Amino acid sequence: MSSRAVTIGIALLPCLAAAPLAAQTRPAPLQDPVATMKAGRPIPGPVFETRNFTRAVENGTRDRTGRPGAGYWTQRVRYDIEAQLDPSKQRVTGRERVTYQNRSPDTLRSVPIYLRQNLFAPGSPRRESVPITGGVTLSRVEAQGAAVPQTKLDSETGPAGYEVFNTIMWIRLARPIAPGDSAAFAFEWSFTPPPSPSDGRQGRESDVYFLGYWYPQVAVYDDVNGWVTDPYINGAEFYMDMADYDVRITVPRGWVVGATGTLRDSASVLNARTMERLAAIRGKRDVAHIISASDPGPGAALASKGSTLTWHFTATNVRDFSWGAGNHYLWDATSALVPNRARGTTDTVAIHSFFRNSAAAAAWPIGGARFTRDAIEQLSLWLWPYPWPQMTSMEGVLTSGGMEYPMMTLMQPWADTLSLAGDLMHETGHMWFPMQVGSNETRHAWMDEGLTQFNTAQAMRALYGEPRTGGRSNDAEPGQRASYTRAARNGNDAALMTWSDLFPLNLYFIDNYNKTAQVLVALRGVIGDSTFHRALIEYGRRWTNRHPDPADFFNTFENVSGRNLSWFWVSWFYRAWPLDQAIGSVVEDGDSMAITVEDRGLVPMPVNLTVTRSDGSVVHVSIPAEEWLTGRRSITGRVPRVPAVLKVQIDAENAFPDLNRANQMWVSGGAER
């Protein structure tokens, strides 16, 4: 059987190659990306560029090639935190010192601090119901070395004071923070962690506590938007600056703690036998039982001094810090070996897995540590090397799915091993997006969830093959495609550029996760596998430890591919347009077979035809997307009539998320479908 590729002659029009972008000459379009109408169909216009982004380009902090500008900056923060968990009172108390460095060119007169546990305070706005715990109790607020009183903030000027607006506290400073200067803040606070199930991201059970967004955290001040203070309402996730953490967590003796960062002074909390077990697996891919079901409880693995133990962790260059504690945890550990091609070395990443001995969590002793190790190694190969010294996966408090934090994932108690593997792959994938490439999840969930969903499918296919029996359908491209197309066929779709908290709840997962993943598959089909992968890696290289805007993602892919893809971005991101390409007819026309393709949807996409002949040969025919931009609804092309054409199929490789596969195939002697 032979195969060859041709581009068919389009009736009356030449086939147009995609026009390359001139080097940094594309103007900044400010109009709405609504389509102009040609021949009754909408034609996507240029990508909308926000005024804030245009101003950042003018200020030299952004560049329309997708690179950070020469004057790009981010702020820097350090957190020193001491926290205590009292399970008998179901209470967490803490105190912290924050050092905030203003690396922007602007003078800051007020600073907003997130108090996200106020989601659980009476009267706080929220998208879904949650347990009411009372929220955060502040017992001390200090800025620039002096106590700050609670007051009404009617203006940016005036004496120092603070006011709490649900999940955000604004502090008006006694002295503005000039460019290049730093300011210190101190807080003492307490709260009751919500009972599980709470909000799907943290909580408590009788024997497990997991603390996410648990401490006062400075909001992001960036070069595009200034202070970003979207309230936390239990819909969209987060937007955070990179920071350094030094955290001490005091828990009752017998409770094991896992956390973001590296455990320091381990001899103060672990006994000699436990430390020997950890040392024995350092640099090895074997899985070791640090605390096993045959051990006499977690307390036997710990130091025996006093009624409490203080676990000390440090983490460098992470955007957040989370931790979990349990008094019935088993603990497995191993090592991931991550080749670092740039240095010609292999990095060792310590892998920790904490889980309870239960039928509901039956997959964890089989795969908790192993799947986490495999995810780190595979994603490091697909993307770029994992940068931190450890990774922890923890079972508990969630009733569905998982949640990501730097160097840490929280999971439901999976019993099915392949489902656990997929869940761990997805949440571990977030260690790249957004934990390194720090997009604003609060506004653009697709930038981390969609990319991670796409990367999950690639890594799962590499490790476990495809199709697979069992597991979660959304961890593979076919399942992602089915999820999106099923919803869209029923009219349930939204533009991906819809701000995250404004997404209809029934579409948040379908569109931000699965639709985006399928749009990336389609983009790969448009620009080619190798170009797509180069652009993805380049986007990560440019924006690791930085805050990309959607325009930076779009511009990077155009810059790397050398193509103007405005029609693609507008169609798939700014509009909820359907794709429906159909075989209109296949008829004899002299010495040729005339193949008419109809565009019955709205998205202009390339047409990839597979023509199968009677001698077994296969001809691949392509029509560029630009042909639809003239307003056409149908295009007719021709191939030689001999050898006889037996079958014509659109997109045989399922590269594009077409809503109606039933009209994409014609078979000789049969009904057109």
Q: Model-derived features: where do they sit?
A:
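Hydrophobic alpha-helical and helix-loop surface patches within well-folded domains
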Residues: A23, I43-E49, F53-R62, F313, ...
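N-terminal, polar/Ser/Thr-rich
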Residues: Q24-T93, E205, S566-W567
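A surface-exposed beta-strand-loop module
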Residues: V34, A39-G40, R91, Q101, ...
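Short, hydrophobic/aromatic-enriched beta-strand segments in well-ordered soluble domains
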Residues: E96-V98, N102, I113-Q117, L173, ...
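Solvent-exposed beta-hairpin/edge-strand motifs
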Residues: L108-L153, P252-W255, T612-S622
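Glycine/proline-rich low-complexity spacer/linker segments in large multi-domain proteins
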Residues: G123-G134, S190-Y245, S266, W331-A336, ...
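Hydrophobic helix-coil surface modules that form long, contiguous segments used
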Residues: V220-G226, A236-M425, F454-A457, E466
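Beta-strand-rich binding/interaction modules
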Residues: G258-A259, V586-D651
